């Protein structure tokens, strides 16, 4: 079967590899669509990062580069392994793409996403969504309704990142949120917030991203910091108080500074983006306003609720898909476009079976 294989920085190859074995306790999936994630781009431009370098196998998967890529994917079950009796051939599914140790508890209230040596399918080994087929442990396979188109279903994984950020924020219906940055995660986070009855203000410089936020209906207000004083505008929109929650989705220090100043006293500020460099923060403002600054990473028992929001029609993922491509065009039409034209491309999805 065809698969996209990461060898090293700038070296991703489309190769023929053996089909996976559907072992006991696993589910065989024909991949329908797989999204290209910002993490994939970082691996391509700067890696290996999450991907274990050649000769240095991951302690759980036992694999190192080359590995099959892709962790945002949907598909159709073609086989189930021995012991799997609650999923049937032909069901539509998405995958929560974790690689964790078998003895880590994954029930409600656990923090399995923070466990030692955690990694992701499509990065740390165990196959990937940028291939025709994959076999995944039953625990990480989530059935979805046939009402959700499989191309949109590929966005449930990044949507779950947004949902986990929402959970971490403690936001509730009627609150006002400020989202710094309208990239893919910022937009999907905003979609979750709107679905939960929260008023959303987005701050963004890019015209294309502002347009996408407007077209998708995920923002009540969109502020361009090159045109207005964001903090002053937020105060006007909140009767002088500031926002209840804020989300940093850019890895840009000026945005972080703006969010701190736009928060009301006792607000929660969630850092969503992955920073590759140190940040500074006005600690005096944090202290004097008793702000609660929180991190968030990936997701943890978020997929069920995220799937429900989409199935019930509270979130429409179609507006966020900006291009559909074949696996053979992964680098030339996928990675290269996202690297050089990332403002206009929200989510490019790949069909490995075309």
UniProtKB/Swiss-Prot annotation:
PROSITE patterns, alphabetized: ADH_ZINC
Cofactor binding notes: Binds 1 Zn(2+) per subunit.
One Pfam family of this chain: ADH_zinc_N
GO molecular function: oxidoreductase activity, acting on the CH-OH group of donors, NAD or NADP as acceptor; zinc ion binding
Family matches, as SUPFAM superfamilies: GroES-like, NAD(P)-binding Rossmann-fold domains
Known role: NAD-dependent butanediol dehydrogenase which catalyzes the oxidation of (R,R)-butane-2,3-diol to (3R)-acetoin and of meso-butane-2,3-diol to (3S)-acetoin. Preferentially oxidizes (R,R)-butane-2,3-diol, with a catalytic efficiency approximately fourfold higher than with meso-butane-2,3-diol. Shows a very low activity with (S,S)-butane-2,3-diol. Can also catalyze the reduction of (3R/3S)-acetoin and diacetyl in the presence of NADH.
Keyword terms: Metal-binding, NAD, Oxidoreductase, Zinc
Signal peptide annotation: none
Stretches assigned to the Enoyl reductase (ER) domain: 10-350
Entry similarity comment: Belongs to the zinc-containing alcohol dehydrogenase family.
Cross-referenced InterPro entries: ADH-like_C (IPR013149), ADH-like_N (IPR013154), ADH_Zn_CS (IPR002328), GroES-like_sf (IPR011032), NAD(P)-bd_dom_sf (IPR036291), PKS_ER (IPR020843)
Entry note: thermal dependence: Optimum temperature is at least 50 degrees Celsius for the oxidation reaction and around 45 degrees Celsius for the reduction of (3R/3S)-acetoin.
UniProt-recorded name of the protein: (R,R)-butanediol dehydrogenase
Gene name tied to this protein: budC
CDD domains to which the protein is assigned, alphabetical: butanediol_DH_like
Entry cofactors: Zn(2+)
UniProt EC number: 1.1.1.4
Reaction it catalyzes: (R,R)-butane-2,3-diol + NAD(+) = (R)-acetoin + NADH + H(+); (S)-acetoin + NAD(+) = diacetyl + NADH + H(+)
Binding site for Zn(2+): 37, 71, 157
pH dependence statement: Optimum pH is 9.5-11.5 for the oxidation of either (R,R)-butane-2,3-diol or meso-butane-2,3-diol and around 6.5 for the reduction of (3R/3S)-acetoin.
């Amino acid at each position: 079967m065809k698969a996209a294989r990461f060898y090293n920085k700038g070296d991703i190859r489309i190769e023929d590899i053996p089909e996976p074995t559907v072992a006991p306790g696993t589910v065989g999936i024909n991949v329908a669509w797989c999204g290209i994630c910002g993490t994939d781009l970082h691996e391509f431009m700067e890696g290996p990062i999450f991907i274990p370098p050649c000769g240095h196998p991951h302690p759980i998967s036992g694999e190192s580069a080359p590995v099959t890529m892709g962790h945002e994917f949907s598909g159709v079950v073609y086989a189930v392994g021995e012991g799997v009796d609650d999923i049937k051939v032909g069901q539509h599914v998405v995958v929560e793409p974790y690689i964790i140790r078998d003895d880590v508890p994954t029930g409600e209230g656990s923090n399995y996403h923070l466990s030692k040596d955690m990694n992701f399918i499509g990065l740390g080994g165990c196959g990937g969504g940028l291939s025709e087929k994959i076999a995944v442990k039953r625990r990480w396979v989530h059935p979805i309704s046939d009402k959700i188109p499989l191309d949109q279903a590929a966005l449930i994984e990044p949507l779950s990142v947004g949902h986990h950020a929402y959970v971490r924020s403690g936001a509730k219906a009627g609150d006002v949120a400020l989202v710094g940055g309208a990239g893919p995660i910022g937009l999907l986070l905003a979609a979750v917030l709107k679905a939960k009855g929260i008023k959303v203000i987005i701050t963004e410089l890019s015209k294309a991203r502002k347009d996408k936020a407007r077209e998708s209906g995920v923002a009540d207000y969109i502020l361009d910091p090159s045109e207005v004083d964001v903090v002053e505008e937020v105060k006007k929109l909140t009767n002088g108080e500031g926002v209840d929650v804020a989300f940093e989705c850019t890895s840009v220090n000026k945005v972080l500074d703006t969010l701190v100043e736009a928060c009301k006293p006792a607000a929660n500020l969630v850092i969503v983006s992955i920073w590759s460099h140190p940040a500074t923060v006005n600690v005096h403002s944090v202290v004097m306003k008793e702000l609660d600054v929180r991190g968030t990473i990936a997701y943890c028992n978020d997929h069920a609720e995220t799937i429900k929001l989409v199935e019930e029609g509270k979130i429409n993922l179609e507006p966020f898909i900006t291009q559909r491509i074949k696996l053979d065009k992964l680098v030339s039409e996928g990675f290269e476009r996202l690297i050089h034209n990332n403002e206009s491309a929200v989510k490019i999805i790949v069909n490995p079976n075309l």
